[in-house]
Structure formats: C-alpha cells, structure tokens
Amino acid sequence: MNITEIIKDAFLFPSKNMERFAVYLVLSVLMTVFILGGTLVYPWGFFNVDNYAIGGIYLVIALVIGFFISGYHLKVIKSGIELDDEVPVFELGENFLGGFEITIISVFYFIIQAFIIAVAVLATNVFGNAIATVQEIRLQIFNVFFMVNSADIAVDAISNAVFNFIISLAITIAVALIVFLIFSILQSASQARLANTDSLKDALDIFEALKDIKRIGIVKVLLLVLLVLVIISVMATIFIILFNYLPLAVSVIYILLVPYIALAIQRLIGLAYSDIA
C-alpha cells in the first residue's frame, strides 16, 4: 500500500464499527480516570493510611485495563497486517495475554533507551555542569557581596558556567529525542512482528525488527511518522485555539479523539507492515 492509502485506511478504520470503538473509548476513559484517581489519592496516604490502599487499588485497576487495551492494540495491528477491514472483537483472555507480551516489549525497549540516555548524560556531564553552575553563582554572589571581585567578572564567570550547562543539556535532550524516535519505530516494528508471528522471541529480536523497517523502506516509515505528527500537531493547534471559545465542546471532542487516533495508529502500524508480511 502507498502512504496515502495507509493514512486514509488507518484514520477511517475505527469508525467502521462504532459499537466496538465505543467499548474501546469507555475502557480508555476508565483507565485515565483510575490513573488520575490513584495518582491524586495515593500521596494523601501520608495523612491517612487508607489512602495508600485506595490509591494503590485505583492504579492496579488502571494497570489491568491497560493490559487489556494493549492486547486489543495487538489485534488491531494484526488486522492491518492481514488487510482485514473488520474492527476486531474484544476477547478477554487473548487481550490480556497480548497486553502482557506488549508490556514485555515496552520494558525491553525502555531499558535500552534508558541505558543509552544515561550514557549520554554521563558523556555530556549535564548534572556536573548543573552543580558547577549553582556553585559558581553562589561563589560569585559571595565575591561581589564581599567585594572580592567586580560585578563584571562575576557576570562573566556565571555566564560561562550557564553556557556550558545549556550546551550539555541541549545535547542530552537532542540525543534523548533521537533515541526516543528511533526506538519508538523499532518498538512498533517489534509489535508488528509479534502480531504477525505470535512469537515473543521473534518480537524481541531487535536486529530483525531493524531489517523489517529497511524492507518496508526507511523513507516510507519516516514519512508516515512525519505525516502522523503533522496531523496530530494541526489538530492540537486547532483544539488549543478553539478551547478559549468552546472549552466544554472541545474537551468532549478531545476525549473522543485521543482514543480514536490511538486506534488509528495501531492500524497504521499493521498496514505498513503488511507489505512485507
């Protein structure tokens, strides 16, 4: 399939069965509510021990729903690979198992990303530069206050320290963003491999996932990512503008649209992978 066909099919797919999308929407909203509830209630355990239990229960429920949703995403990816136009049904056991496998893949890629970013942080010495900047500011304030140095010398010293910190921070952020983009694409390929082979071992083969991306076409994959980002950015901009005038209506549309886009992206992953399946 070409890029236009993939984008069109993916973003129309959730609307092909509104009843199943409604179930997915309710699950997504419930998960969000329980995450927010658990996050807000749990810290209050400092004042009332019962809040620890309540917050923990909320978060566990959110985790269970998250497993189920992730497993359903796997079925949507599989429908794209098989070019099946029917929106998948919800199956309790299969969705939970799929969600567990997707979670393993997510943790696997998170560990790799965290390691690479940690190396980047050490290489750029961003924390060391941050500490050095704070120390330099305190030192120069002391020097100026007790007239050890002039204000000009203090400003120059602080400026150099701040500059070094900003450069190291900028490099670290750039590396983190690039790593996140690359491994997000690799993770999507691994999820597609899982949907296609039903093998977690095959899905975790990062080198084969990379080969799959090359077979699909790196340019094609990057264009799909870029188009999705553009679509989301345009919609987000429109929402931000309209929110000032119609906050309630925009909030409702946002709640409906975020799960819709999430489902469309899973379909897009499957369709892109269908070329080599």
Predicted regions and their residues:
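Interfacial aromatic "cap" segments that immediately flank transmembrane helices
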Residues: 2-33, 90-115, 183-236, 273, ...
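Short, small/hydrophobic-residue-rich motifs at membrane-helix boundaries and re-entrant hairpins
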Residues: 23-81, 98-157, 162, 172, ...
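Juxtamembrane/interface motifs at transmembrane-helix termini
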Residues: 41-45, 231-233, 240-244
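Selective recognition of hydrophobic, aromatic-rich stretches within alpha-helical transmembrane segments
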Residues: 50-81, 162-202, 237-277
